[in-house]
C-alpha cells in the first residue's frame, strides 16, 4: 500500500485501500481483505497519517478450542518527517524520518503491525465461554460432561466437611 506524496498539495487527503492479508504476510486466520481508510494531512515537510483498519478472521478459542469469526478494528497514527526538519514532536514511536525528495510512502508494514497488535492476547469465542472439562475434554459450552464431580483426593476432605457445615448453617 503506497501513498504518492511527490507533488502533493498541503492539506488533508483521503485514501482507501483493500488488501489481501496474505500480501502483508499474515496467517491463514484472516479470511477477507483488510480495509484501510487513511487520512493524510500534509504541511510543508511533514505528513500526519491517521488510519483505521478493519479485517475479519477466524480464530481458535483459547478456552474451548472452537473456531469462531471475529472482526478486528484498530487505528493508528504516524508522523512522517523529512530529514533535517524540525518537527517538535516528543514521541519517537510515532515518527518516521523519510529522505528528502521521497515521492512514495509505503504503509504496508505499519498496517501489518497494527493488525497483529489488534489481536487480543486471549481469544475467546464469547465472554461466557466455559472451556473444556479438565478430565474428559468435553466442551462445557455444549452441556455438562459425564465426569464425576466428586474428588478422591483425601487432602480436601476436611475442607469439604467445613463447606457442607457452612452451607447447612446458612439454611
PLM regions: where:
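Structured interface patches
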Residues: 1-171
Amino acid at each position: 500500500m503506497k501513498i504518492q506524496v511527490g507533488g502533493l498539495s498541503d492539506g488533508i487527503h483521503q485514501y482507501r485501500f483493500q488488501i489481501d492479508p496474505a500480501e502483508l504476510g499474515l496467517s491463514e486466520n484472516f479470511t477477507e481483505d483488510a480495509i484501510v481508510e487513511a487520512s493524510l494531512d500534509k504541511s510543508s515537510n511533514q505528513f500526519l497519517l491517521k488510519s483505521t483498519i478493519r479485517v475479519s478472521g477466524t480464530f481458535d478459542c483459547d478456552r474451548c478450542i472452537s473456531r469462531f469469526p471475529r472482526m478486528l478494528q484498530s487505528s493508528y497514527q504516524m508522523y512522517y518527517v523529512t530529514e533535517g526538519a524540525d518537527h517538535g514532536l516528543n514521541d519517537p514511536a510515532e515518527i518516521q524520518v523519510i529522505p528528502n525528495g521521497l515521492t512514495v510512502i509505503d504503509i504496508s508494514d505499519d498496517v501489518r503491525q497494527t493488525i497483529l497488535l489488534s489481536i487480543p492476547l486471549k481469544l475467546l469465542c464469547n465472554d461466557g465461554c466455559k472451556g473444556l472439562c479438565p478430565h474428559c475434554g468435553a466442551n462445557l459450552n455444549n452441556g455438562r460432561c459425564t465426569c464425576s464431580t466428586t474428588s478422591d483426593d483425601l487432602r480436601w476432605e476436611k475442607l469439604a466437611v467445613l463447606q457442607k457445615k457452612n452451607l447447612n448453617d446458612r439454611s
